[in-house]
């Protein structure tokens, strides 16, 4: 991997971690409004774990995540996830507006990286020999 690719990977990872952290803060603020707006808090209950996984996955692999949520392991999957999180987040406060903007922009950046032929592969995208489908690691022969 060339030096430019390493700088690009570091930048993309920093962007994803920052976006995930700000989105997590935005969903925490949205969750705190459970008394005034229940549906916003319900959306935050779904968005919070998805945004926490965006950050956590950049530092450490999650067991079985690749089998059940393989969209975390491609640029297009992360782009769609970030656009979904942006739609789930109601931009009412400062953190929520920042998170909405960052999620929306990062979603389009990830989609552009998926369509680019020279996009570097992130270390968190590596398969490490695990199967991508449920039960594919078992070698059962049917007779």
From Swiss-Prot:
Q: GO biological process: any one?
A: vesicle-mediated transport
Keyword Membrane appears in the UniProt entry: yes
Parts of the chain that traverse the membrane: 14-34, 37-57, 69-88, 94-116
Its annotated compartments are: Golgi apparatus membrane
Keyword terms: Golgi apparatus, Membrane, Transmembrane, Transmembrane helix
Membrane topology is: Multi-pass membrane protein
Role noted for this protein: Golgi membrane protein involved in vesicular trafficking.
- Additional free-text comment from the UniProt record: Present with 4540 molecules/cell in log phase SD medium.
What family does the entry list? Belongs to the TVP15 family.
Listed name of the protein? Golgi apparatus membrane protein TVP15
């Amino acid at each position: 991997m060339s030096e430019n690719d390493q700088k690009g990977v570091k930048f993309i990872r920093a962007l994803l971690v920052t976006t995930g952290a700000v989105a997590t803060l935005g969903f925490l603020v949205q969750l705190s409004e459970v008394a005034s707006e229940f549906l916003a808090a319900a959306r935050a209950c779904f968005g919070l774990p998805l945004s926490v996984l965006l950050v956590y996955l950049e530092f450490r692999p999650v067991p079985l995540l690749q089998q059940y949520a393989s969209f975390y392991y491609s640029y297009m999957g992360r782009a769609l996830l970030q656009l979904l999180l942006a739609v789930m987040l109601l931009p009412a406060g400062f953190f929520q507006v920042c998170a909405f903007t960052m999620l929306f922009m990062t979603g389009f950046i990830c989609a552009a990286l998926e369509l680019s032929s020279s996009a570097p592969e992130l270390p968190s995208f590596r398969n490490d020999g695990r199967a991508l489908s449920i039960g594919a690691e078992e070698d059962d022969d049917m007779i």
